Amino acid sequence: MDSAPLLQIDGLGKRFGAKVAVDGLSFSVAAGEIVGLLGPNGAGKSTTFLALAGFLRPEAGTISWNGVALGHDRGRTIALIPETPEVYPLLTVWEHLVFVAKSNALAPGWEKKAGELLERLGLGGERDTLGRALSKGMRQKTLIAATLLADTPVLLLDEPMIGLDPQGQRELREMLFDLRTTGKAIVISTHMIEQAQQLCDRIVILKDGRFVAAGTFDELRERVGREDAEELFLELTRA
């Protein structure tokens, strides 16, 4: 990417007692780029996301946005959509956006943008649907609409494909490609290299909380000398 990094992570570290969950992790994400955080279960992906979003305090490292180090309260800069997206069960899709508008003191006229976002994300017909009646895919979209309405520049999605049927996965891919054109910095976590290959401009591979490799899929393939995606992943994460 030609643009300067929007999000920069340097030396991120997090422990739980004697267990090292993330150890000296560094990577960057540019505006309009999708980066995949790839690794087996227990690699430290979710811990990294929780630390980036401010839900966990790392013991080491810095997180910067546009060259400025972020403090612990960074919810207006980095939004996390967890593996199991949670919405308010008794609020409608539209009421979620009303809540965002009020809590962020958005300027008058936000309703037009909110309506356009719902249509863009395929939620136009779900405007009055209660949160408890939404599928996982619809909950994801509701949270994404909220982050876009608040104009949060960095979007983290933890294992976003899990639990989605093939149509839902296809819709999510199309939505992420569309979001990339808006200049958002997007990071997804996954343990499946095929998904990372399909979705991501670059891939950052972790194992046991440590950085293993990073690059485009083609760069990683050339480095390892493996054509098959699964063989490539196994080779890079081999003990």
Regions found by a protein language model. Name each.
Residues G61-R76:
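Conserved ABC transporter NBD signature motif
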Residues A214-G215:
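ABC ATPase "signature
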